[in-house]
Amino acid sequence: MATADPKKKKKKRKKKESLEHKRNRILVALGIFAVVYALDEFGTLTAAFGTPGDVYASFVLFLVPFLIAGYDVLQKAFNNIRRGKAFDESFLMAVATIGAFAMVLFPDTDPHMAEGAAVMLFYQVGELFQAYAVGKSRKSISAMMDIAPDYANVEQPDGTLEQVFPDDIAVGTVIVVKPGERVPIDGVIVEGETQLDTAALTGESVPRPAKTGDDIISGCINMTGLLHVRTTKPFGESTVARVLELVENASEKKARTENFITRFARVYTPAVTGAAAVLALGGGLVTGAWSDWILRGLTFLVVSCPCALVISVPLSFFGGIGGASKLGVLIKGSNYLETLADVDTVVFDKTGTLTNGTFSVVAVHPEAGYTEQSLLEVAALAESFSDHPIAQSVRTAFQGELDPKRVSDSTNDAGHGVTAIIDGKRVIVGNAKMLAVAGIEAPNCEIVGTILHVLVDDTYAGHIVIADTIKTDAEQTIRDLHAAGVKRTVMLTGDSEEVAASVAKQLGLDEFHAQLLPGDKVERVEALLAAESGKGKLAFVGDGINDAPVLTRADVGIAMGAMGSDAAIEAADVVLMDDKPSNISRAIRVARKTMSIVWQNIIFALGIKLLILVLAALGIANMWLAVFGDVGVAIIAILNAMRAMGVKNL
């Protein structure tokens, strides 16, 4: 029987135990620190040991919580110095706190063991908080990682089910998916019907119906019926495997802002450390007040720790990507999220993106005493032997039972229509050209689409309009994009000028370009890119079918309805797991909210640190204020970064 990977479970459990151990250690150190601090403040140590015995007693007692809380920081700092990598937060904390304890050697100044122990304690509290914050922000992506099934059920000759690792299932194998189980591999349903929960992949809370003959993708939960599924892909190429690979690799693609912060920290930390040394040595040499200037230098060191930036900025991007995943929006890296925030031009492919990509009857105009239903029935009977999509849409619109015995002598005139004898009457269903051959002038119709005219015994019975229907949320999406500051919305299509103009007008698009071949779309996007000014970016949205060249060329390629589409997942920078255009505007809002949070944290952290550095140099800031400048600012920045995960109201 297949089971989940025990190594992953063991690693996860070990990490959790390590975090709990650190938390308990810090709580013990905090308790001891509180007791010692109270004894020191209330004069108990002075009463017990006198002067200067109270100072040495205080030194020893504060050293206990200091070592309990910070031994791992001191150990890491020592190891890094041995490796030649001194300038990190562990080194800064070690030097600053040991220096605070060493101030006891200067009899002309107040002892600072309490500050030294407090700096280490609160630094560790901040580190613990950061660990919890990162863990929380990973939950949405961890939930996404849980879509990977542990096994697949394969029916044996004796009728029993054997649980097999999905990797071991060959293409074409029929697997059994019980109610409540995840679909392990992409395939087609050969027996059964059910409701599918696709929330983990698409963010869609409404279950989707599925029946025999329907395609089914891995990662969905079978909610009701027992399914027999014939696999169409190996597990490694299934939707769930591709999505997991995408999510796991997202952290490798860094945003420009993220890379800047990393480079900045490499310069900032040694620069401030050097400034601290110059401040302490220079001030001491000039004034002779060594204890005062060394204390200022130590305060500099505490504030110089860059953790508020190096933690909160990546955490903001991580939270934004995780929050987007809740909506079924997979962003391949923080660099694409950053670019998405600057998008001011959105280019759409029409079919399958703004429209449903399927023909359907949008209007029925009967004449000569026919009703809508009777006109549809005559047309559906005439088209009953055709497999053309237009014929199928007419039969679907009729919805009633069709008796093929009523039809005789059916002929198909390619590019024009069909002629058939129905109940002894000669019926012609076709376009305006076929009508002209019969000597009848086609009436005008204001509705744009493919028009089927119906003649019964040379009498005009009416016409049926068939079109690719616009998606229900497409019009609102365009309004939302304009409201979000997108300056230009453009539609590219291979359809006629008339159809394109109708769709563009209905949706409120800024411009459209019709009768384009796939290669023409790339050229059109190139021209739009050349017209971009400033930092504005261009996003192209397609359904993943034949859109790879344009998706790749755009600043941001967005593939819609990508469930099961390997080409789309490969070519796009952002993958929308369902076919709702509304998620495009939501993805842009997530990106802009994330970038706003990133810059809030950068400005806040640098502003506070710069202020405290100036105050420390002037001798106004003490070690306690430095603790706020480091740990306090880091915690506030992290709390702000966690807001990036909140996407419910976007």
Report the location of each language-model feature.
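Conserved catalytic phosphorylation-site environment of P-type ATPases
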Residues: 89-94, 201, 260, 295, ...
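Juxtamembrane helix-loop transition segments at the membrane interface in multi-pass membrane proteins
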Residues: 78-88, 129-143, 315-334, 642-650
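Flexible metal-binding regulatory segments at protein termini and peripheral loops
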Residues: 1-54, 64, 161-163, 241, ...
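Bilayer-spanning, highly hydrophobic alpha-helical transmembrane segments
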Residues: 30-31, 259-290, 296-314, 599-628
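P-type ATPase nucleotide-binding
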Residues: 178, 365-488, 497, 509-525
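Conserved ATP-binding TGD loop and adjacent catalytic N/P-domain core of P-type ATPases
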Residues: 424, 456-600, 608
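Actuator/coupling domain of P-type ATPases
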Residues: 2-16, 62-151, 170-175, 182, ...
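Residue-level signature of catalytic and energy-coupling elements of molecular machines
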Residues: 77, 112, 133, 152, ...
